[in-house]
Structure formats: C-alpha cells, structure tokens
Amino acid sequence: MILNSSTEDGIKRIQDDCPKAGRHNYIFVMIPTLYSIIFVVGIFGNSLVVIVIYFYMKLKTVASVFLLNLALADLCFLLTLPLWAVYTAMEYRWPFGNYLCKIASASVSFNLYASVFLLTCLSIDRYLAIVHPMKSRLRRTMLVAKVTCIIIWLLAGLASLPAIIHRNVFFIENTNITVCAFHYESQNSTLPIGLGLTKNILGFLFPFLIILTSYTLIWKALKKAYEIQKNKPRNDDIFKIIMAIVLFFFFSWIPHQIFTFLDVLIQLGIIRDCRIADIVDTAMPITICIAYFNNCLNPLFYGFLGKKFKRYFLQLLKYIPPKAKSHSNLSTKMSTLSYRPSDNVSSSTKKPAPCFEVE
C-alpha cells in the first residue's frame, strides 16, 4: 500500500497510489478463516499450558517460568485476533476506532518481541542446564528467571511503543474506506528504516543466531557424550529435536521478516511498482498467519519435549485435578541428562536421560 496524505479540518486523509494492492476476494475469505483457527487452537492450547505449568507442575523450574510467560504473551496477542479477522473480512475496513487500532497493533508487536526474547532466553537456559549444569546452578534460579521475564516484558513493551504512537486510523479518499495503518511522512525516512531494521535485527537476526549457537553447542556436547557411550540412536533423536527447534523458528519468521522489509521500502516510496505492492500486500497476511500460528504453538511444542508435561497435559484433558502435594525437584530440570560433558567427565558410563524436560 503506497500512501500519500493530506490533513483537512484536523482529519488525516490518505491517497492510496495502489488502491487494489492486496485486495483479493480469496484473501478476504481465507485469512479470517485462518485467524479464527489460530484463535481457537491458540486460546485452547496456551490456556492448557498455563494450567498445567502453574497448577500441576507448580512453577518450580527456570524453564517452566519461561514457558509460562511465553503462553501468557501468546494469550495477550490472541485476544486481539478477532479484531484483525473482522478487519480483513470487511475488506480492510477498520470499524473499531483509533484506540483499539493502537492497542491491537501494539499487541502484535509485543507478542513478536516477547516471544522471540523468551525463546532466546530458553535456548540459553537449556545450554547452561545441559552443558554447564554445576557452574550455572547459582545463576539459574527462580528469582533470576522471574526478573529476566519482567525485563523481557518491559523491553517488548518498549519495542511496541512505535505502534501505539504511529499506528492510526486513516481515511483513504480514493477508495472511501477507513483503515488501521502505519503512515510515514515521505520526507522523514529515519523512523520507518529504524523500525524496520529493529524488527529485522532485534526481532529475528540476533535471536536466531543466539538460538542457533546455543543448540549447536548443546548438540556437540550431547554428541560427545553419546559417542563415549556408543548410543547412536539416542544421538540421532537429539539431533532431530534440535534441528526441528532451529528450523521451526527460522521458517516461521523469515517470510514475515522479508515482506516486512519490502513493505517499509514501499511505504518510503523506494518501491513504486503497484505489481510489487500487490504481491507484498497479498503475501503479508499469509506470512503473519505462518509466523503467529507457529508462535502460538511454541509453548505446546517445547512443553511436549518433556515427559512430565506430557503426562500432566493428558491428565488435565481427562479432568484429573492436580495433587495437593507437589513433588520435590532439582532446579536444573527440563534437562534430566545425567551425563555432564563439561562438569563431570568421570560419569561417562551413566545412561543419559531425556534432555529437554520441563520438570
């Protein structure tokens, strides 16, 4: 969408140079349907994750703190998804006013940064728990995890401020519709470039490199352990899990990041071809569905890597209430790996346990 604006009587009015870009009947049907599916699956799955971690597992490990906050961040975003479904079904007509436009937009931005930051911290925590369990015991505490989550929520909130400030309801004169959109003044290119690069670098590139590095080091440590024990099948299983985690993150977000960058170029007028604008505006909601659907599945995905989480989850589905007394647990769990390659060389004869337990 290429926008030109004017102000009359204090009302922001916009001329869209490519009024038909991204406006296809199949988009107006398919995207609201996908949003509805994401909403139902996400609310159901993440609510169960919160119940399992908080009431059944009693929130006793560092990893469970991160997963709980991940599920809560997803729920905050999912509550605004019906607004976007209605907006798309009404052919990009925003009927909810300027206030909800800002709140819903900030929620999308907040979820992006909060989820990515939490997944990054979770990967670092897994690295410390598996590769340096003894050295990291003093750092991997519940207090540190909770403070880290508070900092993440504050940073995500800070990163969402541009959506609150610059996202507004505009009236497009040549199509006679009201939209909820970002609009940048053509003479001020610093802001959109800065926001686009922040989203690409801080919201994807740096976290991906940290996640990739953390899980690569985990795999190398486990590979060494399993080679000593001559346990090749187990080594292959761990490699597949780690590859799934890294690729799951990468392919969920890379399409959205690419088209976000192209959208900024269109907004700035660097790209003026309406055919390219149509491709970007058509692809953008599809990439959002891919990114945020996978994002909302993350708590379930990571949780089901642990046997206890899986057991409690199935127990909840059978309406079995949590026990009054909780089990005692070591603070290093989510990895119950008994072989410690960096801290306990003499334990090479021990049999490794599952390495991604939540509790």
From Swiss-Prot:
Residues 335-359 are annotated as: Disordered. The keyword NADP does not apply. Changing N111G: Induces a conformational change in the angiotensin II-binding pocket, leading to constitutive activation of the receptor. Glycans are attached at N4, N176, N188. One of its GO terms (cellular component) is plasma membrane. The chain crosses the membrane at residues 26-55, 62-89, 99-125, 142-165, 191-216, 240-268, 279-304. Residues 1-25, 90-98, 166-190, 269-278 are extracellular. GO terms for biological process: angiotensin-activated signaling pathway; blood vessel diameter maintenance; calcium-mediated signaling; cell chemotaxis; G protein-coupled receptor signaling pathway; inflammatory response; kidney development; low-density lipoprotein particle remodeling. Changing M284A: Slightly affects binding to eprosartan inhibitor. Residues 335-350 have a biased composition (Polar residues). InterPro entries: ATII_AT1_rcpt (IPR000190), ATII_rcpt (IPR000248), CCR1-9-like (IPR050119), GPCR_Rhodpsn (IPR000276), GPCR_Rhodpsn_7TM (IPR017452). C-terminal Ser or Thr residues may be phosphorylated. Residues 56-61, 126-141, 217-239, 305-359 are cytoplasmic. Disulfide bonds join C18-C274, C101-C180. It is a multi-pass membrane protein. SUPFAM superfamilies: Family A G protein-coupled receptor-like. GO terms for molecular function: angiotensin type I receptor activity; angiotensin type II receptor activity; bradykinin receptor binding; protein heterodimerization activity. Receptor for angiotensin II, a vasoconstricting peptide, which acts as a key regulator of blood pressure and sodium retention by the kidney. The activated receptor in turn couples to G-alpha proteins G(q) (GNAQ, GNA11, GNA14 or GNA15) and thus activates phospholipase C and increases the cytosolic Ca(2+) concentrations, which in turn triggers cellular responses such as stimulation of protein kinase C. Interacts with MAS1. Interacts with ARRB1. Interacts with FLNA (via filamin repeat 21); increases PKA-mediated phosphorylation of FLNA. This is Type-1 angiotensin II receptor. It comes from Homo sapiens.
